[in-house]
Amino acid sequence: MQKDFIFTSESVSEGHPDKMADQVSDAVLDAILTQDKHARVACETLLTTGLCVIAGEITTTAVIDYNQIARQTIKRIGYDSSDIGFDYNTCSVLVTVGKQSPDIAQGVDRAHDDYLDQGAGDQGLMFGYACNETPVLMPMPIHLAHRLTERQSELRKDGRLPWLRPDAKSQVSIRYVDGKPHSIDTVVLSTQHDPEVSHAQLSEAVIEEIIKPVLPKDMLSADTRYLVNPTGRFVVGGPMGDAGLTGRKIIVDTYGGASPHGGGAFSGKDPSKVDRSAAYAGRYVAKNIVAAGLADKCMVQVSYAIGVAKPTSLMVDTFGTGKIPEAKIVELIQAHFDLRPKGIVNMLDLLRPIYTRTASYGHFGRDEPEFTWEVTDKAAELKAAAGL
Protein backbone atom coordinates (compact mmCIF):
# COMPACT_ATOMS: atom_id res chain seq x y z
CA MET A 1 0.00 0.00 0.00
CA GLN A 2 1.31 3.46 -0.93
CA LYS A 3 2.66 5.35 2.10
CA ASP A 4 3.43 8.81 0.67
CA PHE A 5 0.58 10.51 -1.20
CA ILE A 6 -1.87 13.41 -1.26
CA PHE A 7 -5.51 12.63 -0.42
CA THR A 8 -8.43 15.01 -0.97
CA SER A 9 -11.96 15.29 0.41
CA GLU A 10 -14.70 17.88 -0.05
CA SER A 11 -17.64 19.26 1.87
CA VAL A 12 -20.59 21.46 0.92
CA SER A 13 -22.53 23.95 3.03
CA GLU A 14 -26.12 23.66 4.19
CA GLY A 15 -26.99 26.12 1.41
CA HIS A 16 -25.76 23.84 -1.37
CA PRO A 17 -28.85 22.74 -3.34
CA ASP A 18 -28.27 19.01 -2.83
CA LYS A 19 -27.84 19.57 0.91
CA MET A 20 -30.97 21.73 0.97
CA ALA A 21 -32.84 18.75 -0.48
CA ASP A 22 -31.36 16.42 2.15
CA GLN A 23 -32.44 18.79 4.93
CA VAL A 24 -36.01 19.09 3.64
CA SER A 25 -36.28 15.29 3.38
CA ASP A 26 -34.97 14.81 6.91
CA ALA A 27 -37.16 17.61 8.27
CA VAL A 28 -40.16 15.71 6.88
CA LEU A 29 -38.86 12.51 8.50
CA ASP A 30 -38.40 14.22 11.87
CA ALA A 31 -41.86 15.76 11.78
CA ILE A 32 -43.37 12.33 11.13
CA LEU A 33 -41.28 10.54 13.78
CA THR A 34 -42.37 13.14 16.34
CA GLN A 35 -45.94 11.84 15.96
CA ASP A 36 -45.41 8.26 14.76
CA LYS A 37 -42.11 6.58 15.58
CA HIS A 38 -43.03 3.43 13.66
CA ALA A 39 -43.73 5.23 10.38
CA ARG A 40 -42.23 4.05 7.11
CA VAL A 41 -40.64 7.01 5.37
CA ALA A 42 -38.79 7.31 2.07
CA CYS A 43 -38.88 11.02 1.24
CA GLU A 44 -37.15 12.56 -1.77
CA THR A 45 -36.83 16.28 -2.52
CA LEU A 46 -36.07 18.16 -5.74
CA LEU A 47 -35.16 21.85 -5.71
CA THR A 48 -34.82 24.09 -8.74
CA THR A 49 -35.46 27.75 -9.49
CA GLY A 50 -38.57 28.75 -7.54
CA LEU A 51 -39.74 25.17 -6.99
CA CYS A 52 -39.54 22.49 -4.29
CA VAL A 53 -40.96 19.03 -5.06
CA ILE A 54 -41.46 16.47 -2.28
CA ALA A 55 -42.09 12.87 -3.38
CA GLY A 56 -41.74 9.35 -2.05
CA GLU A 57 -43.46 6.53 -0.21
CA ILE A 58 -44.69 7.29 3.31
CA THR A 59 -46.92 5.12 5.50
CA THR A 60 -47.85 6.85 8.77
CA THR A 61 -50.61 7.93 11.12
CA ALA A 62 -48.92 11.33 11.44
CA VAL A 63 -50.55 14.42 9.96
CA ILE A 64 -47.96 16.99 8.88
CA ASP A 65 -47.83 20.15 6.79
CA TYR A 66 -45.29 19.33 4.08
CA ASN A 67 -45.57 22.83 2.63
CA GLN A 68 -44.65 24.59 5.86
CA ILE A 69 -41.91 22.10 6.75
CA ALA A 70 -40.21 22.75 3.41
CA ARG A 71 -40.54 26.53 3.68
CA GLN A 72 -39.28 26.72 7.26
CA THR A 73 -36.30 24.50 6.47
CA ILE A 74 -35.34 26.67 3.50
CA LYS A 75 -35.81 29.81 5.64
CA ARG A 76 -33.52 28.43 8.37
CA ILE A 77 -30.84 27.71 5.78
CA GLY A 78 -30.98 31.36 4.71
CA TYR A 79 -32.75 31.54 1.36
CA ASP A 80 -35.14 34.44 1.88
CA SER A 81 -34.88 36.28 -1.44
CA SER A 82 -34.88 35.34 -5.11
CA ASP A 83 -31.90 37.71 -5.44
CA ILE A 84 -29.69 35.11 -3.71
CA GLY A 85 -31.10 32.07 -5.51
CA PHE A 86 -34.31 31.09 -3.71
CA ASP A 87 -37.11 32.56 -1.60
CA TYR A 88 -38.79 30.30 0.95
CA ASN A 89 -41.84 32.57 1.01
CA THR A 90 -42.64 32.78 -2.70
CA CYS A 91 -41.43 29.42 -4.03
CA SER A 92 -43.89 26.75 -5.14
CA VAL A 93 -44.03 23.53 -3.10
CA LEU A 94 -45.46 20.44 -4.80
CA VAL A 95 -46.15 17.27 -2.80
CA THR A 96 -46.66 13.86 -4.39
CA VAL A 97 -46.41 11.15 -1.75
CA GLY A 98 -47.64 7.54 -1.90
CA LYS A 99 -47.52 4.64 0.57
CA GLN A 100 -44.94 1.91 1.07
CA SER A 101 -45.50 -1.10 -1.18
CA PRO A 102 -47.35 -3.87 0.71
CA ASP A 103 -44.88 -6.37 -0.77
CA ILE A 104 -42.03 -4.55 0.97
CA ALA A 105 -44.03 -3.98 4.16
CA GLN A 106 -44.71 -7.69 4.69
CA GLY A 107 -40.97 -8.40 4.67
CA VAL A 108 -40.05 -5.52 6.93
CA ASP A 109 -42.80 -6.01 9.48
CA ARG A 110 -42.22 -9.74 9.88
CA ALA A 111 -38.84 -11.20 9.04
CA HIS A 112 -38.72 -14.64 7.45
CA ASP A 113 -35.84 -15.93 9.57
CA ASP A 114 -36.85 -14.51 12.97
CA TYR A 115 -40.48 -13.62 13.70
CA LEU A 116 -39.46 -11.63 16.76
CA ASP A 117 -37.45 -9.21 14.68
CA GLN A 118 -37.97 -6.69 11.94
CA GLY A 119 -36.50 -7.62 8.59
CA ALA A 120 -34.23 -5.37 6.56
CA GLY A 121 -36.11 -2.85 4.42
CA ASP A 122 -34.04 -3.72 1.37
CA GLN A 123 -31.02 -5.68 0.26
CA GLY A 124 -27.71 -3.85 0.21
CA LEU A 125 -24.21 -3.43 1.53
CA MET A 126 -23.02 -0.77 3.96
CA PHE A 127 -19.64 0.35 5.25
CA GLY A 128 -18.44 1.78 8.53
CA TYR A 129 -15.02 3.34 9.02
CA ALA A 130 -12.83 4.93 11.67
CA CYS A 131 -9.17 5.89 12.01
CA ASN A 132 -7.01 7.68 14.56
CA GLU A 133 -6.09 10.68 12.37
CA THR A 134 -8.31 13.05 14.39
CA PRO A 135 -9.74 13.12 17.94
CA VAL A 136 -13.18 12.19 16.56
CA LEU A 137 -11.60 9.20 14.77
CA MET A 138 -12.40 10.49 11.28
CA PRO A 139 -10.08 10.91 8.28
CA MET A 140 -8.47 14.34 8.48
CA PRO A 141 -9.37 15.62 4.97
CA ILE A 142 -13.15 15.25 5.37
CA HIS A 143 -13.06 16.40 8.99
CA LEU A 144 -11.34 19.67 8.07
CA ALA A 145 -13.48 20.17 4.96
CA HIS A 146 -16.63 20.00 7.12
CA ARG A 147 -15.22 22.44 9.65
CA LEU A 148 -14.55 24.94 6.85
CA THR A 149 -18.11 24.88 5.51
CA GLU A 150 -19.45 25.06 9.07
CA ARG A 151 -17.28 28.12 9.68
CA GLN A 152 -18.55 29.76 6.48
CA SER A 153 -22.12 29.29 7.68
CA GLU A 154 -21.30 30.57 11.16
CA LEU A 155 -19.73 33.81 9.89
CA ARG A 156 -22.56 34.31 7.41
CA LYS A 157 -25.29 33.89 10.00
CA ASP A 158 -23.72 35.95 12.80
CA GLY A 159 -23.03 38.87 10.45
CA ARG A 160 -19.24 38.97 10.73
CA LEU A 161 -19.00 38.52 6.95
CA PRO A 162 -22.38 39.94 5.90
CA TRP A 163 -21.69 39.63 2.17
CA LEU A 164 -21.56 35.84 2.32
CA ARG A 165 -24.46 33.90 0.83
CA PRO A 166 -25.63 30.35 1.73
CA ASP A 167 -24.09 28.24 -1.06
CA ALA A 168 -20.48 27.12 -0.49
CA LYS A 169 -18.04 24.26 -1.04
CA SER A 170 -14.69 23.35 0.47
CA GLN A 171 -11.94 20.92 -0.50
CA VAL A 172 -8.88 19.92 1.51
CA SER A 173 -5.84 18.05 0.17
CA ILE A 174 -3.62 16.46 2.83
CA ARG A 175 -0.09 15.24 2.22
CA TYR A 176 0.53 11.88 3.90
CA VAL A 177 4.02 10.68 4.82
CA ASP A 178 4.48 7.07 5.90
CA GLY A 179 0.71 6.71 5.85
CA LYS A 180 0.04 9.53 8.34
CA PRO A 181 -1.16 13.12 7.80
CA HIS A 182 1.89 15.36 7.47
CA SER A 183 0.80 18.72 6.07
CA ILE A 184 -1.99 20.51 4.22
CA ASP A 185 -1.13 20.83 0.55
CA THR A 186 -4.13 22.72 -0.88
CA VAL A 187 -7.33 24.27 0.44
CA VAL A 188 -10.16 25.25 -1.91
CA LEU A 189 -13.09 27.31 -0.67
CA SER A 190 -15.77 28.57 -3.02
CA THR A 191 -18.50 30.69 -1.47
CA GLN A 192 -21.49 32.49 -2.87
CA HIS A 193 -21.34 36.24 -2.20
CA ASP A 194 -23.02 39.58 -2.77
CA PRO A 195 -22.09 41.19 -6.11
CA GLU A 196 -20.60 44.30 -4.47
CA VAL A 197 -17.69 42.57 -2.71
CA SER A 198 -14.41 42.48 -4.64
CA HIS A 199 -12.52 39.25 -5.20
CA ALA A 200 -9.50 40.63 -3.33
CA GLN A 201 -11.60 41.57 -0.30
CA LEU A 202 -13.40 38.23 -0.34
CA SER A 203 -10.21 36.21 -0.74
CA GLU A 204 -8.43 37.92 2.15
CA ALA A 205 -11.43 37.61 4.48
CA VAL A 206 -12.04 33.96 3.63
CA ILE A 207 -8.39 33.00 4.19
CA GLU A 208 -8.00 34.97 7.44
CA GLU A 209 -11.48 34.54 8.96
CA ILE A 210 -12.67 31.15 7.70
CA ILE A 211 -9.71 29.01 6.65
CA LYS A 212 -6.86 29.80 9.04
CA PRO A 213 -8.88 29.68 12.29
CA VAL A 214 -10.06 26.16 11.41
CA LEU A 215 -6.92 24.47 10.13
CA PRO A 216 -4.26 23.12 12.54
CA LYS A 217 -1.34 25.56 12.49
CA ASP A 218 1.22 22.76 12.63
CA MET A 219 -0.23 21.35 9.39
CA LEU A 220 0.27 24.61 7.45
CA SER A 221 3.45 25.64 5.67
CA ALA A 222 4.70 28.29 3.28
CA ASP A 223 3.86 25.85 0.48
CA THR A 224 0.17 25.46 1.43
CA ARG A 225 -2.01 26.77 -1.41
CA TYR A 226 -5.26 28.66 -0.79
CA LEU A 227 -7.70 28.78 -3.71
CA VAL A 228 -10.66 31.03 -2.94
CA ASN A 229 -13.43 31.31 -5.54
CA PRO A 230 -11.03 30.28 -8.33
CA THR A 231 -13.46 31.37 -11.08
CA GLY A 232 -13.39 34.89 -9.63
CA ARG A 233 -17.15 35.25 -9.08
CA PHE A 234 -19.89 33.22 -7.36
CA VAL A 235 -23.02 35.39 -7.12
CA VAL A 236 -25.62 33.06 -8.64
CA GLY A 237 -25.98 30.01 -6.39
CA GLY A 238 -28.41 27.75 -4.60
CA PRO A 239 -31.17 26.09 -6.63
CA MET A 240 -30.98 28.93 -9.17
CA GLY A 241 -27.42 27.89 -10.00
CA ASP A 242 -27.94 24.11 -9.89
CA ALA A 243 -30.87 21.82 -9.22
CA GLY A 244 -30.70 19.97 -5.91
CA LEU A 245 -31.69 16.37 -5.18
CA THR A 246 -31.80 14.27 -2.03
CA GLY A 247 -28.99 11.73 -1.80
CA ARG A 248 -26.45 13.23 -4.20
CA LYS A 249 -23.74 13.96 -1.62
CA ILE A 250 -23.18 10.50 -0.17
CA ILE A 251 -19.37 10.82 -0.02
CA VAL A 252 -19.63 14.21 1.71
CA ASP A 253 -22.07 12.56 4.13
CA THR A 254 -19.64 9.78 5.06
CA TYR A 255 -15.83 9.59 4.88
CA GLY A 256 -14.85 11.82 1.98
CA GLY A 257 -13.77 8.88 -0.17
CA ALA A 258 -11.45 7.37 2.44
CA SER A 259 -13.72 4.33 2.71
CA PRO A 260 -15.85 2.49 0.15
CA HIS A 261 -19.56 3.31 0.02
CA GLY A 262 -22.42 0.88 -0.51
CA GLY A 263 -24.29 3.40 -2.65
CA GLY A 264 -27.36 4.01 -0.51
CA ALA A 265 -28.13 7.56 0.60
CA PHE A 266 -29.29 8.42 4.12
CA SER A 267 -31.60 11.44 4.18
CA GLY A 268 -35.36 11.03 4.14
CA LYS A 269 -35.20 7.38 5.21
CA ASP A 270 -36.57 5.97 8.47
CA PRO A 271 -34.35 3.52 10.42
CA SER A 272 -35.99 0.42 8.93
CA LYS A 273 -33.94 1.29 5.83
CA VAL A 274 -30.57 -0.34 6.42
CA ASP A 275 -28.98 2.06 3.94
CA ARG A 276 -29.08 4.48 6.84
CA SER A 277 -29.28 2.52 10.09
CA ALA A 278 -26.67 -0.12 9.19
CA ALA A 279 -24.24 2.54 7.95
CA TYR A 280 -24.63 4.26 11.32
CA ALA A 281 -24.08 0.92 13.06
CA GLY A 282 -21.00 0.28 10.93
CA ARG A 283 -19.53 3.59 12.06
CA TYR A 284 -20.39 2.74 15.69
CA VAL A 285 -18.63 -0.61 15.41
CA ALA A 286 -15.56 0.72 13.61
CA LYS A 287 -15.16 3.69 15.95
CA ASN A 288 -15.34 1.50 19.05
CA ILE A 289 -12.77 -0.90 17.59
CA VAL A 290 -10.32 1.96 17.00
CA ALA A 291 -11.15 3.58 20.36
CA ALA A 292 -10.44 0.23 22.04
CA GLY A 293 -6.98 0.15 20.48
CA LEU A 294 -7.70 -2.99 18.46
CA ALA A 295 -6.58 -1.17 15.29
CA ASP A 296 -5.44 2.27 14.13
CA LYS A 297 -7.77 2.07 11.14
CA CYS A 298 -10.85 -0.09 10.67
CA MET A 299 -13.38 -0.64 7.91
CA VAL A 300 -16.47 -2.78 8.46
CA GLN A 301 -18.74 -4.08 5.70
CA VAL A 302 -22.17 -5.54 6.47
CA SER A 303 -24.86 -6.71 4.03
CA TYR A 304 -28.55 -7.57 4.17
CA ALA A 305 -31.37 -9.25 2.25
CA ILE A 306 -34.84 -7.71 2.17
CA GLY A 307 -37.13 -9.17 4.82
CA VAL A 308 -34.28 -11.02 6.55
CA ALA A 309 -33.19 -9.83 9.99
CA LYS A 310 -29.69 -11.28 10.26
CA PRO A 311 -26.90 -9.78 8.13
CA THR A 312 -25.92 -11.90 5.16
CA SER A 313 -22.24 -11.04 5.65
CA LEU A 314 -19.81 -9.23 7.93
CA MET A 315 -16.24 -8.29 6.99
CA VAL A 316 -13.47 -6.32 8.72
CA ASP A 317 -10.32 -4.78 7.23
CA THR A 318 -7.76 -3.11 9.51
CA PHE A 319 -5.28 -2.35 6.70
CA GLY A 320 -2.41 -4.01 8.53
CA THR A 321 -2.92 -1.93 11.69
CA GLY A 322 -4.79 -4.54 13.74
CA LYS A 323 -3.41 -5.62 17.11
CA ILE A 324 -5.31 -8.90 16.91
CA PRO A 325 -6.37 -11.00 13.87
CA GLU A 326 -9.30 -9.67 11.86
CA ALA A 327 -11.14 -12.97 12.30
CA LYS A 328 -11.03 -12.39 16.06
CA ILE A 329 -12.39 -8.85 15.59
CA VAL A 330 -15.31 -10.28 13.59
CA GLU A 331 -16.04 -12.64 16.49
CA LEU A 332 -15.97 -9.71 18.93
CA ILE A 333 -18.37 -7.72 16.76
CA GLN A 334 -20.80 -10.63 16.61
CA ALA A 335 -20.61 -11.03 20.40
CA HIS A 336 -20.96 -7.34 21.35
CA PHE A 337 -23.15 -5.73 18.67
CA ASP A 338 -26.63 -6.72 17.47
CA LEU A 339 -26.59 -5.87 13.77
CA ARG A 340 -30.13 -6.98 13.01
CA PRO A 341 -32.19 -3.94 11.93
CA LYS A 342 -34.28 -3.91 15.10
CA GLY A 343 -31.15 -4.52 17.17
CA ILE A 344 -29.51 -1.49 15.56
CA VAL A 345 -32.57 0.68 16.19
CA ASN A 346 -32.59 -0.32 19.87
CA MET A 347 -28.81 -0.10 20.28
CA LEU A 348 -28.59 3.42 18.84
CA ASP A 349 -32.05 4.68 19.88
CA LEU A 350 -32.92 5.64 16.31
CA LEU A 351 -36.71 6.08 16.55
CA ARG A 352 -36.32 9.76 17.45
CA PRO A 353 -36.62 13.00 15.44
CA ILE A 354 -32.85 13.50 15.27
CA TYR A 355 -32.15 13.47 11.56
CA THR A 356 -32.32 17.06 10.31
CA ARG A 357 -29.05 17.81 12.11
CA THR A 358 -27.32 14.95 10.30
CA ALA A 359 -28.23 16.34 6.88
CA SER A 360 -25.45 18.94 6.75
CA TYR A 361 -21.75 18.86 7.73
CA GLY A 362 -21.49 15.07 7.85
CA HIS A 363 -23.29 12.20 9.54
CA PHE A 364 -20.09 11.09 11.29
CA GLY A 365 -17.42 12.69 13.47
CA ARG A 366 -19.93 14.84 15.35
CA ASP A 367 -20.20 15.27 19.12
CA GLU A 368 -23.85 16.35 19.47
CA PRO A 369 -25.94 14.08 21.74
CA GLU A 370 -28.21 13.04 18.85
CA PHE A 371 -25.30 11.20 17.24
CA THR A 372 -25.44 8.05 19.37
CA TRP A 373 -23.37 6.11 16.82
CA GLU A 374 -20.39 8.31 17.74
CA VAL A 375 -20.30 7.13 21.37
CA THR A 376 -17.38 4.84 22.29
CA ASP A 377 -19.16 3.09 25.16
CA LYS A 378 -18.16 -0.37 23.90
CA ALA A 379 -14.42 0.35 23.74
CA ALA A 380 -13.54 -0.83 27.26
CA GLU A 381 -15.38 -4.14 26.97
CA LEU A 382 -13.93 -4.79 23.51
CA LYS A 383 -10.42 -4.12 24.81
CA ALA A 384 -10.96 -6.46 27.76
CA ALA A 385 -12.47 -9.18 25.58
CA ALA A 386 -9.51 -8.92 23.21
CA GLY A 387 -7.10 -9.38 26.11
CA LEU A 388 -5.26 -6.11 25.48
Swiss-Prot record:
Looking at its record, which EC class is this enzyme? transferase
Q: How is the cofactor bound?
A: Binds 2 divalent ions per subunit. Binds 1 potassium ion per subunit.
**Signal peptide feature range:** none
Tell me the route in metabolism or biology where this protein functions: Amino-acid biosynthesis; S-adenosyl-L-methionine biosynthesis; S-adenosyl-L-methionine from L-methionine: step 1/1
Q: What is its EC number?
A: 2.5.1.6
A cellular component annotation (GO) from this entry: cytoplasm
Q: Does the keyword S-adenosyl-L-methionine apply?
A: no
Cofactor(s) the protein requires to work: Mg(2+); K(+)
Q: Which domain of life is it from?
A: Bacteria
Query: Which of this chain's residues are annotated to bind K(+)?
Result: E44
Region of interest called Flexible loop, as start-end residue ranges on this chain: 100-110
Per its record, the protein catalyses:
L-methionine + ATP + H2O = S-adenosyl-L-methionine + phosphate + diphosphate
Keyword annotations from UniProtKB, A to Z: ATP-binding, Cytoplasm, Magnesium, Metal-binding, Nucleotide-binding, One-carbon metabolism, Potassium, Transferase
Q: Where does L-methionine bind?
A: E57, Q100, D242, K273
Name where it's found.
Cytoplasm
User: Principal localization?
Assistant: cytoplasm
Task: Provide the family line.
Answer: Belongs to the AdoMet synthase family.
Protein task:
Catalyzes the formation of S-adenosylmethionine (AdoMet) from methionine and ATP. The overall synthetic reaction is composed of two sequential steps, AdoMet formation and the subsequent tripolyphosphate hydrolysis which occurs prior to release of AdoMet from the enzyme.
Its subunit composition reads: Homotetramer; dimer of dimers.
For this entry, the protein name equals S-adenosylmethionine synthase
